[in-house]
Amino acid sequence: MSRSIKKGPFVDAHLIKKVDTAVAGKDKKPIKTWSRRSTILPEFIGLTIAVHNGRQHVPVYINENMVGHKLGEFALTRTFKGHAADKKAKR
């Protein structure tokens, strides 16, 4: 079930504060955050946000197609190495 429209999108308060200071200061440094649950707002467009994936911070450049999605969708937490090749199929 999606979030109620009357509540509005959820964004952590500390992330909004960091974005506001970056926009006001024209700062191009990535904003480091652990808040994967925050929704991307139109104010974030053009910023680079380093989202934590459990091991490191993955830089995510925000564009207009990402608005409305969560930050965690763009920082993958699992790495797929591929399945082992079948020995019978090789012969």
Swiss-Prot record:
Q: Which Gene3D superfamilies match?
A: 30s Ribosomal Protein S19, Chain A
SUPFAM superfamilies under this entry? Ribosomal protein S19
Any one Pfam family match given in the protein's UniProt record, by short name:
Ribosomal_S19
| Record keywords, A-Z | Ribonucleoprotein, Ribosomal protein, RNA-binding, rRNA-binding
Q: Does the keyword Heme apply?
A: no
List the GO cellular component terms: cytoplasm; small ribosomal subunit
GO BP: any one term: ribosomal small subunit assembly
* InterPro entries with a match to the protein in the record: Ribosomal_uS19, Ribosomal_uS19_bac-type, Ribosomal_uS19_CS, Ribosomal_uS19_SF
- Alphabetized GO MF terms: rRNA binding; structural constituent of ribosome
Q: Which PROSITE patterns does the record cross-reference, listed alphabetically? A: RIBOSOMAL_S19
Record function comment: Protein S19 forms a complex with S13 that binds strongly to the 16S ribosomal RNA.
NCBIfam families attached to this UniProt entry: rpsS_bact
Q: Which family does it belong to?
A: Belongs to the universal ribosomal protein uS19 family.
What is the protein name for this chain?
A: Small ribosomal subunit protein uS19
